[in-house]
Amino acid sequence: MINIGLSGSTGKMGKTITERIDKFKDCKISAKFNSTNNLDDLDNFCKNSDVIIDFSTPEILEKLINYALKHNTKLVIGITGLQPQHFKLLEKAAQTLPILYSANMSIGANLLSYLARKATKILDDYDIEILETHHRNKKDSPSGTAIMLAETIASEKGLNIAFNRGNRPRCEKEIGISSLRGGNVHGIHEISFLGDDEIITLKHEALNKNSFAIGAIKAAIWLQDKSPALYSMQDIYNYSLKKQL
């Protein structure tokens, strides 16, 4: 039985993971951490967990990593809004621990990333734009998923990523990200490939948070026998595909 520690347990993702964990017979939630806890509580939290799923806030990440290193506790990080210094912490810790980071844990969003990479190779002379839509209370903009998609596409074509063009026209070697906020939208991501004569759009819409929660739990299970490294959800799906072939 895999003991999963849940960080951010009182948030929307934490509650959804708690609801979905019973679908998995080989793991259980052994410890919880949320905003009512003291940061020093992370010591016992990590000690009582084989792996931690973290959907809290960037502010606790450094402390969480330090205690995870102390107790050799694996990490699944789903926090968005991370800054370059946070990724440096993850990369350094991943030399000692297996860590999986993803801005989006759902299979659909990661399939969208895969398809976008393939389409980018084929549609070489098309302009590419991303539109992401989320609920009115989402704090970060653009979304972590939109950035993930843009970075995937940009790496294929050597493009710059434009978050806010202001009053200037579109540059030739760039991919733009636009954001909408409103309502109770769980997440919509559209990638448009715009040619002179046609437009091709790839779209993923999350109807609820279940797919994110299930993906995070699967990531925690998958990570159990992995060597120290910084993994992504793409590693899980590539690994699963290879096992089937």
From Swiss-Prot:
This is 4-hydroxy-tetrahydrodipicolinate reductase. It is found in: Cytoplasm. Its EC number is 1.17.1.8. Catalyzes the conversion of 4-hydroxy-tetrahydrodipicolinate (HTPA) to tetrahydrodipicolinate. The gene is dapB. It comes from Rickettsia felis (strain ATCC VR-1525 / URRWXCal2) (Rickettsia azadi). One of its GO terms (cellular component) is cytosol. Pathway: Amino-acid biosynthesis; L-lysine biosynthesis via DAP pathway; (S)-tetrahydrodipicolinate from L-aspartate: step 4/4. It catalyses: (S)-2,3,4,5-tetrahydrodipicolinate + NAD(+) + H2O = (2S,4S)-4-hydroxy-2,3,4,5-tetrahydrodipicolinate + NADH + H(+); (S)-2,3,4,5-tetrahydrodipicolinate + NADP(+) + H2O = (2S,4S)-4-hydroxy-2,3,4,5-tetrahydrodipicolinate + NADPH + H(+). One of its GO terms (molecular function) is NADP binding. (S)-2,3,4,5-tetrahydrodipicolinate binds at H135, G144, T145. The keyword Cytoplasm applies. GO terms for biological process: diaminopimelate biosynthetic process; lysine biosynthetic process via diaminopimelate. Belongs to the DapB family. NAD(+) binds at G8, S9, T10, G11, K12, M13, G78, I79, T80, S102, A103, N104, M105. Keywords: Amino-acid biosynthesis, Cytoplasm, Diaminopimelate biosynthesis, Lysine biosynthesis, NAD, NADP, Oxidoreductase. InterPro entries: DapB_C, DapB_N, DapB_N_CS, DHDPR_bac, NAD(P)-bd_dom_sf. The active site is at H134, K138. Its main location: cytoplasm. The keyword Lipid biosynthesis does not apply. CDD domains: DHDPR_N.
